[in-house]
Design a protein with these regions (language model features):
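Transmembrane alpha-helices and adjacent helix-loop boundaries
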Residues: 1-225
Length: 225
């Protein structure tokens, strides 16, 4: 093998890779937060709403979870302009990831709702707790503790695999920056070796942060490692 690694080229452009890493984290965080809101709303509908309201949610979840995220984002980026709707590549990626995360988090949160036993609510009623107090002191802590590890793991999936799809539609997140820079000097191995390590660092930071937050807020350890 006559290939000579030249990481000096990567170091000269490391600032741009760092910008891509920051954008990656921002996209992952916003996508997860938006998806969590959708997931909470849809999980509540599936768990407690009548069939006529549950049906659209079921269709949404089945459609999204049974098609690749890339196809969904391509539809937003390439399909919507055919109908006169044009969004930036960043907007298409963000909306696509939010909708995708919302469907998966709906299933996770629904499992949390189903884990609350009727006897626990009845015990709250016997103690004289109002509906709001039952939700605050019984439902929310129980659900949060049961679903937090799964949600923490899903955030890592969004952060690494979800955001990197944006490189295929021109988003300059971490993978996109590496593709752009390596296409100039053709040092593909160097750039992608470095961003692989950067992804490891990103996920490590996120994992530690989520584990510490889980212990502090819910007294539960997110088993990520």
């Amino acid at each position: 093998m006559n290939y000579t690694f030249q990481y000096g080229v990567v170091w000269k452009n490391f600032g741009e890779l760092l910008d891509g890493a920051i954008l990656t984290f921002q996209l992952g965080a916003v996508s997860f937060a938006g998806g969590a809101l959708i997931g909470l709303f849809c999980a509540a509908l599936i768990s407690y709403a009548p069939f006529i309201l549950r049906l659209p949610v079921h269709i949404y979840v089945v459609a999204v979870t049974n098609t690749p995220a890339l196809i969904q984002i391509y539809f937003l980026y390439y399909g919507l302009p055919e109908f006169g709707i044009r969004w930036s590549s960043e907007a298409c990626l963000l909306i696509g990831l939010i909708l995708n995360a919302g469907a998966y988090l709906t299933m996770i949160m629904r499992a949390g709702f189903l884990s609350v036993r009727r006897t626990e609510l009845e015990a709250g009623q016997v103690l004289g707790l109002s509906v709001v107090q039952q939700v605050r002191y019984i439902v929310v802590p129980h659900i949060a503790k049961s679903i937090y590890p799964a949600m923490a793991n899903f955030f890592i999936v969004i952060l690494v695999m979800g955001t990197s799809v944006g490189a295929l539609i021109g988003v300059d997140e971490l993978t996109g920056q590496a593709i752009n820079l390596s296409s100039v000097n053709y040092r593909w191995l160097e750039y992608f070796t470095v961003i692989a390590l950067m992804y490891v660092v990103l996920t490590f930071i996120a994992s530690v942060g989520l584990a510490l937050f889980g212990r502090w807020a819910f007294r539960v350890r997110a088993r990520i490692f």
